[in-house]
Amino acid sequence: ETCPSYYRDASAEASIDDTADFLHAVSAMPGNNGQVMPVITPRFIPTCSDAALRGLGDLAAETGAHVQTHCSEDDWEHAHVQRRCGMSDTAALQDFGLLTDKTILAHSTFIDDDDMAMIAAAGSGVAHCPLSNVFFSNAVFPLRRALEKGLHVGLGTDISGGPAASLMDTARMTAIASRMLEEGVDASLRAGARGVPSSRVDFRTAFW
């Protein structure tokens, strides 16, 4: 229902079969020798059927392939998954078998402490995309809290989500966004109620 008819797979089975063929084709490329790894990529839960998600989770378990997908990027996605699945995006991905130690979750702006615990336990990683989040995510990812909870977090440029594909620019924006989260942005609120204390990270943390 959230994907136009001209952009849909013929069926969940066809999607899974095509993905399996893709995994094999990339792995079998002459001279690859594991240097290029294929990735299972359900774009995000709203554009995938339950059957497709579960099948891709089974395929990930069978092949040991990496997984990348969006997770709790914005208000709409976060609320959509809650309504559809009765649980958070993170919990739903875990239920579908897509939360593994080879999973990268893009954005994850709205994850809470319970989600962070699941992600850490699974050994999954988060791709923090601060510049893209400014345009699309409706909030700032709580990077410092995620690091303190033991999450693996890397930087993502999300090339379609902003004007720069530079990781150095992304590192700068990471530090800036963390300051905005800590200090707050609504000047009508008093200082103590405006932000989230102890949220900032310095550029050294952002870079590494």
Please give the residue ranges for each predicted region:
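Metal-coordinating catalytic core of metallo-dependent amide/deamination hydrolases
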Residues: 1-109
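Catalytic core of soluble alpha/beta enzymes
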Residues: 73-122, 134-145, 159-169
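Acidic, glycine-rich active-site loops and adjacent beta-strand->loop/helix elements
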Residues: 2-4, 132, 161
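His/Asp/Glu-enriched, well-ordered alpha-helical/loop segment
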Residues: 95-98, 102, 144-208
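Electropositive phosphate-/nucleotide-binding environments in soluble metabolic enzymes
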Residues: 9, 13-16, 46, 50, ...
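Generic beta-sheet signal
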Residues: 1, 129, 156-158
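Short, contiguous acidic/charged loop-to-helix segments that flank catalytic cores in large enzymes
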Residues: 133-134, 197
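Glycine-enriched alpha-helix->loop->beta-strand junction motifs that scaffold or abut catalytic
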Residues: 57-66, 98-101, 118-127, 148-153
